[in-house]
């Protein structure tokens, strides 16, 4: 053996000893869904559903847009913070998601998507739910090459999963315009049953991929977003009755489906978050929670600042802490913090069968 060969061998040995095996620390966090939880995947796609330009991110720690549909932190960021993770999971399409950063989890969410594949067609290129789940499978293969299959299975089974999807199936599909294809095909109750049936398939596939704890959020107060107030032409700020009816049909059936799945599986894999009720509290009495309005968006134009996109040319409020809505559809960071507080410690009025803190303590 030559001296150069010995030196090369010793160098490789020292690198191995110093670096050691990759150890999984903390709890991985995986995120699936739409713009409420997208942390930047759409930045890497040719799509109109983007939040990568100012003033998005105006209150983010870097003061720069990241692809989050928020003035600052979104719900995955705040949950990551609450469960003690140093960083929120990176977007799956981010080139920075490699090596050890994979062990923190990944965010697969994509703005504009819905439960149904035809939802959000107007946004062109988005990561639909089936593709998000395919990416999750791909993620597990990548991590297996890093830490081995048994460790990967353990990482996934002990991880927390958040899935937020369904609102776009109403706003950007059934009620997108009068006499939409889906509204001609289904009555609203039948359409809700279709969504629940398709959502059940998504959750069953997630379960088959080895996850152990899944937080499922409801539709939220769909008819109260500034975009819907502007669209309905209301002058008194009253929420859209048709969209509120949709949410009132959807959320109880979602909870029933989740309870049935847990019973079938034999343990509480799925946790339902009643985000409609959570937001109803500060939508109906905003001043009680330190807001000046729950109807006008901080950033936008037209009635209620609810028309079009939030851009550098839009009206922009000076203090985001006083607004429930950041743009035409999405809550401010302050509102997100209130939602996450309920998710973590809320009673059965908001969380079923238990809140997230109780679930993670099991």
Curated annotation (Swiss-Prot):
GO CC annotations, alphabetized: extracellular region
Q: What is a biological process (GO) this protein takes part in?
A: lipid catabolic process
Give the EC number(s) under which this enzyme is classified.
3.1.1.-
Coiled coil, from the record: none
Location of the active site: 35 (nucleophile), 327, 330
The compartments listed are:
Secreted
Q: What class of enzyme is it?
A: hydrolase
Q: What is its main location?
A: secreted
One GO MF term on file is: hydrolase activity, acting on ester bonds
Q: Which residues are glycosylated?
A: 117, 355
| Keyword Secreted appears in the UniProt entry | yes
Q: Which cysteines are joined by disulfide bonds?
A: none
Q: Keywords in alphabetical order, please.
A: Glycoprotein, Hydrolase, Lipid degradation, Lipid metabolism, Secreted, Signal
| Signal sequence, start to end | 1-19
Alphabetical list of InterPro entries matching this protein: GDSL, GDSL_Est/Lipase, SGNH_hydro_sf, SGNH_plant_lipase-like
Q: Which family is this sequence assigned to?
A: Belongs to the 'GDSL' lipolytic enzyme family.
Q: What is this protein called?
A: GDSL esterase/lipase At5g18430
